[in-house]
From Swiss-Prot:
Top enzyme class: transferase
Summary of the function given for this chain in its UniProt record: Required for the formation of a threonylcarbamoyl group on adenosine at position 37 (t(6)A37) in tRNAs that read codons beginning with adenine. Is involved in the transfer of the threonylcarbamoyl moiety of threonylcarbamoyl-AMP (TC-AMP) to the N6 group of A37, together with TsaE and TsaB. TsaD likely plays a direct catalytic role in this reaction.
Binding-site list for substrate: 134-138, 167, 180, 270
Subcellular location: Cytoplasm
Protein EC: 2.3.1.234
Main location: cytoplasm
Chain positions recorded as Fe cation binding sites: 111, 115, 298
CDD domains: ASKHA_NBD_TsaD_bac (cd24133)
Protein name, entry field: tRNA N6-adenosine threonylcarbamoyltransferase
Amino acid sequence: MIVLGLETSCDETGLALYDSEKGLLGQVLYSQIKLHAEYGGVVPELASRDHVRKMIPLLDQLLNDSQVKKSQIDAVAYTRGPGLMGALMTGALFGRTLAFALNKPAIGVHHMEGHMLAPLLSATPPEFPFVALLVSGGHTQLMAAYGIGQYELLGESIDDAAGEAFDKVAKMMGLPYPGGPNIAKLALQGNPETFEFPRPMLHQGLDFSFSGLKTSVSVQLKKLGEENRDADIAASFQEAIVDTLVKKSVKALKQTGLKRLVIAGGVSANQRLRERLEHSLSKIKSQVYYAEPALCTDNGAMIAFAGYQRLKAGQCDDLVVTTTPRWPMTELSRPAEIIE
């Protein structure tokens, strides 16, 4: 089965082809970073328009690069949510229309389920069950995953997501969008022990809170005034985020008794986070798994793969185009429940 995956939840237009026998046949990705950089963040209307502009050229490029004909596509998977309504609708309408024209099934995929399953595309994929740390611009969650659609929410951010905190602090510091990679780069030049920023809720269950940390950075920047300590600020802020994510992940593993941690989402590409996780998990004889670098950010491959997992169990959507900007993963059903 060859599945076309379409990702348009925010500011990246990603398309990919996944073959159930050969694996990933190819993928293309167009990032709107330059488009939104001058605004310091994503402008939903501009994002939607750019998805419309890029969808067909990217599909043509993907088919050409992969040497696959449209007629060979067996199914279409698109991001149904969560995400920006207009951006989601663009991908959903395109995917549904293409599937209808080809007389093939289509399925809407949960964006974060796609992220969580992306490490399964690696050369050494994790086996279920595992704990998943999902960290992106819109989500920070710890999930226990026992199988496709068998997810238990262990903890989540009660305010800002980790990626959102990175972007907001970067904006305070005058760094360009997107903030996460730029803070990480600047942090390499700084001392993470210079400023003792708070780790909110560190010892309170498995939920996260990053708004207080963001406020603390703002206060410190005002105190410094014209004094340039940006590298130390970046390093200390990043360390506070990483410290919280690592300690909560270790706590989740101990609480569930599981020995495998999957980390996914855009923030999972952060090298300091990876270093700290590998060090901490080695102490408790647990393993950590990541997606390949190209699959950490939003992409079509994770949507194609997640879609295939459900399509092979008999799940598909009807002709009604549905998008769900707010969609908890715990509301997803097991594929077996759908065909029983």
